[in-house]
Amino acid sequence: MKVRYFGTDGIRGVFGDTLTDELAFKVGKALGEIVGEGKVLIGKDTRVSGDSLEAALAAGLTSMGVDVLSCGILPTPAVALLTRITRSYGVVISASHNPPEYNGIKVLKNGYKIPDELEEEIERRMEGEFQRRYVVGKIKSFREGKDMYIGAVLEMFKDLDLSGKSVSLDLANGATTTTAKDVFEFLGAEVEVFNSSQDGLLINQGCGATHPKFLAEEMKRGRIGFSFDGDGDRVIAVDEERNVVNGDKIIGILAEGMMEEGRLRESVVVGTIMTNGGLEEYLRKRGIELVRTKVGDKYVLEEMLKSGANLGGERSGHIIILDRSTTGDGLITALELMRVVERLKKNLSDLAKEIPDLPQITRNVRRTEKTSLENGRLRELIERYSAEGYRIVVRPSGTEPVVRITVEGKDRNRVEEIAEELSRILEG
């Protein structure tokens, strides 16, 4: 059976188990064959395994004659922007929102995550015999990449004055420790920071975009807060009343602001099968169509490029503003949200309350050999509850060995009961 290394967001696994230096070396050699004698940028988050994986990846690339530009700790969207500026390939060593023992490899080209076809080409080369090269590439430090990224973001928001504004940032002990605080301070904000360690054993641990309640509980009232994930491509907001503002609500607020500004293209917003029905209802009332895709920001981007939309994203906080960035960028999303709040002259809490949020529950069921999505009883119940008006999504995770069951409907108690029942059946 053909080996499949790439999932919905690059290669992902537990370091030393399903993700090894040997695998990273092979990825480097395979990518090196494709690149030829060009250059590849490498950035990483703060995980302790990042240095080891970078060394292996760089060894593979340079053995094929490719020069490596080492960016150090830098968010995924920063590396994406740098590949766009330099018109080159890039690799990010990160497992995004996953725990510290995980790591991953994401490949970028000219600002975008590579398509499935190129991932398959890398995999094919990894399983074959590598070409022999007689030219060895060089490894060079490219720490100026951070300043290039910060400069580009500040240029995008040169009309945004945050003087007198108080902002709280949860950096998840991850890659935004190198960028977010500096940018907000350059724009004039008074900044309070949580979880800014670069100790790779702390990344995403009880903090960041997957644990936004940490910031909601720790920050003072009257501030606006932003919780980033480990590699900086997600953000969840916290309003001045310390309520969590999820990705769906952020998308709704941005859509409202961009529409009033005349910036929302095609009157379309792209979401996923996980996007809350409350957002869909909110957008519909404003003449905006929600188009759904499979889960994964790369599928959101594909649909955006196809439909001409410039706003899309996921409830998890992966949000793409295509006239700002070619990928999800938590920092750019946070600044755009601040800009919209200022422009509409409303509190973030008031804007968030305008967007209904239907009760939605997700249960994770560990995948085993017995786990089957073709379970007859499971399919029967999904059909029955769907007919009763509940929206049900059952899908394997693309980044973890679990199956996610999501149930959405107007009755929270019933939603919980249905999610629990379906989980028990799937567990066998």
Swiss-Prot record:
GO terms for cellular component: cytosol. Mg(2+) binds at residues 96, 229, 231, 233. It holds the Pfam family PGM_PMM_II. CDD domains: GlmM. Transmembrane segments: none annotated. It comes from Thermotoga neapolitana (strain ATCC 49049 / DSM 4359 / NBRC 107923 / NS-E). Its cofactor is Mg(2+). Activated by phosphorylation. Keywords: Isomerase, Magnesium, Metal-binding, Phosphoprotein. The modification Phosphoserine is found at residue 96. Binds 1 Mg(2+) ion per subunit. Belongs to the phosphohexose mutase family. Catalyzes the conversion of glucosamine-6-phosphate to glucosamine-1-phosphate. NCBIfam families: glmM. This is Phosphoglucosamine mutase. PROSITE patterns: PGM_PMM. Its EC number is 5.4.2.10. The gene is glmM. The lineage of its organism: Bacteria, Thermotogati, Thermotogota, Thermotogae, Thermotogales. The active site is at 96 (phosphoserine intermediate). One of its GO terms (biological process) is carbohydrate metabolic process. It catalyses: alpha-D-glucosamine 1-phosphate = D-glucosamine 6-phosphate. InterPro entries: A-D-PHexomutase_a/b/a-I, A-D-PHexomutase_a/b/a-I/II/III, A-D-PHexomutase_a/b/a-II, A-D-PHexomutase_a/b/a-III, A-D-PHexomutase_C, A-D-PHexomutase_C_sf, A-D-PHexomutase_CS, Alpha-D-phosphohexomutase_SF.
